[in-house]
């Protein structure tokens, strides 16, 4: 048997073995475990959400004398702030459901420290003088209002035994930004050294761990550089410390949600990302602390900080970044290596969404525009591939003539290319250009909150999730659920069919081995990409259809 044929068969067998092996031994077991964990998590979480809501309500009404709370109410948020310790530990995102089920509760971001999903933020003061009593975790603040809303800020006050007065004004906008202004009035006869601090503390929940294609965990902009540490990184290192630095923001990022501290820009801060195992629970904390500031007797000091706690909407982070000069705030969204392409791709999709009201249709429009921009390149590629095919007999003759002299062989072939004005890599250019576009669209679909639960038409209810149908139960007609590696839906099949048709219309590769391998690519991609976000498959299928139309035009007029 010809060695080339043997190599071809070996390559195909190896490729299919890798695909099926990966699906069966890695993806399938992990998906099964994940499905089991998520089933348990969802069923228990519904109970927890109700219990926690009742618990919060009971605290507010029945135990007001012990743990008083200020209710938070805006079009985007609901929850409360504990007056004891001035802790932001009860926050629900009203506009986002946990899943697509009809009775799904809204997403809860912050939860009190004594709950299973503890997650909270604090802003406060410390002093290096032990004789000075400052507000702490046991301090119960006095408030002039029971409700915090965008229209109605809340003013808090507390006076220590030396007559030093502490004032806090909290405002919230219509989205997810809290502004906390602390004022210290030193009515004593002694100097008062203070340091401003902020912290976000979270109990780690393993079920929330995601794959490694996006960042989740401690993050921030320190000295105008983005700092990202995964949960595992911090767990291994125990801490990451940044000495006195310019801290624009630090926080903890999830796939779609962000909690962050934005300190006053008038000072430098020391920042820390920490891990600790307390009472059997893994806890992660990000915090900042300012240098010592001394308040003279009879003087006062005001410090303004902000807390962002909500959804990572692109336009919202952009707005905050511009309005408050928060460097790299949009990088809380993990746009990846192709940021310079990914974000404009999102802007384009979001722009057309404003007109058509459907991100799936927006993907189709953006794909048409990309195709038009690349038409000239595709036309040149076609001509180059055609010339290469015409030169193949001469290339074969040169190979036979200089088979034992590799240097002369390459020299003669390059001379032939130059004489014929052929660029051997020109045929690959459209594919090379499309690679960053492909990954950019994938990133947009995978990490942006705007794509979460965004429907298309028919059975597609979430562009960021895989096609829920499969040919192996006739797209739901047969009453059984195939294993995960057989979840090959209608859109993956359409992608493979259109890819095959486009190959049939394109010039065949000059190298027969490469040509044979390419014939199997639609089948390989069918299995490989069936678990990808369906929005990506819609893009690829539509791109193939446009390529078929484009190829017909090129074939006809060339």
Curated annotation (Swiss-Prot):
Disulfide bonds: none annotated. One of its GO terms (cellular component) is plasma membrane. GO terms for biological process: protein insertion into membrane; protein transport. The chain crosses the membrane at residues 5-25, 332-352, 355-375, 429-449, 474-494, 520-540. It is a multi-pass membrane protein. Keywords: Cell inner membrane, Cell membrane, Chaperone, Membrane, Protein transport, Transmembrane, Transmembrane helix, Transport. GO terms for molecular function: membrane insertase activity. The keyword Transmembrane applies. The keyword Lyase does not apply. It comes from the Bacteria. It is found in: Cell inner membrane. Its main location: membrane. InterPro entries: Membr_insert_YidC (IPR019998), Membr_insert_YidC_N (IPR028053), YidC/ALB3/OXA1/COX18 (IPR001708), YidC/Oxa/ALB_C (IPR028055), YidC_ALB_C (IPR047196), YidC_periplasmic_sf (IPR038221). Required for the insertion and/or proper folding and/or complex formation of integral membrane proteins into the membrane. Involved in integration of membrane proteins that insert both dependently and independently of the Sec translocase complex, as well as at least some lipoproteins. Aids folding of multispanning membrane proteins. Belongs to the OXA1/ALB3/YidC family. Type 1 subfamily. Interacts with the Sec translocase complex via SecD. Specifically interacts with transmembrane segments of nascent integral membrane proteins during membrane integration. NCBIfam families: PRK01318.1-4 (NF002353), yidC_nterm (TIGR03593), yidC_oxa1_cterm (TIGR03592). This is Membrane protein insertase YidC. It comes from Rickettsia typhi (strain ATCC VR-144 / Wilmington).
